[in-house]
Amino acid sequence: KLKEQEMLVSQKNAELLALHSQINPHFLFNALESIRMHSLLKKENETADMVEKLAIMQRQYVEWGNDAVTVAKECEFVKAYLALQKYRFGERLNYNIDIEADCMECQVPKLTLVTFVENACVHGIESKSSPGWIFVRIGRQEEGLEIEIEDTGSGMAEAKLTELQNNMCNASIEMLKGGGRVGIINACVRLKMVTENRVEFRVEGEEGVGTTVTIRIPCLQEGKTDAESIVSR
């Protein structure tokens, strides 16, 4: 019971920090919409599209009424993020998202999937001069979900792969204070919290070839506890 209370307090503290970062979000959304409409009037369709994608992303960041979202909703955010990054990297970034239909209504903590995609983009594609790919795959595996984020970027040495996997498996609130890959650690902590530590992390890859992160979690359904929400094939 004490451990559960500590986890709830930690989660509430994280949500409070998110609330502190909301500097009049409605003003921001209205401003973005004004810029988008102005761009459309000037027939600057590409700029309008970029602003629209940015608004989608920003709305997810500031709306913390519920930490859980469906896989379908999280994938909308992933698509918006990758589409925006495509404007930045051009032909250097290609991506493919493959989600099995029976996974769409399962729930994941908000912004977890996109955190791993962002990591693949920044640490994989950004440091590579030649074109690369990011693959996002989600499918059913036994009694849960298997989430796979693969990039054909710069990759990592074996020691770094092992270090990253260990950090993900041992992710804790305390680790968030130490800097480093804070986004990844934050995502791992929340995945551990909502699944009651019933999550598996695996990191594979090769330097100069790419990296694959695999996450296995129960298939959580809205309004149910972890034990009740596991859905078999």
What is each stretch, according to the model?
Residues K1-R202, T212:
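Two-component histidine phosphotransfer core
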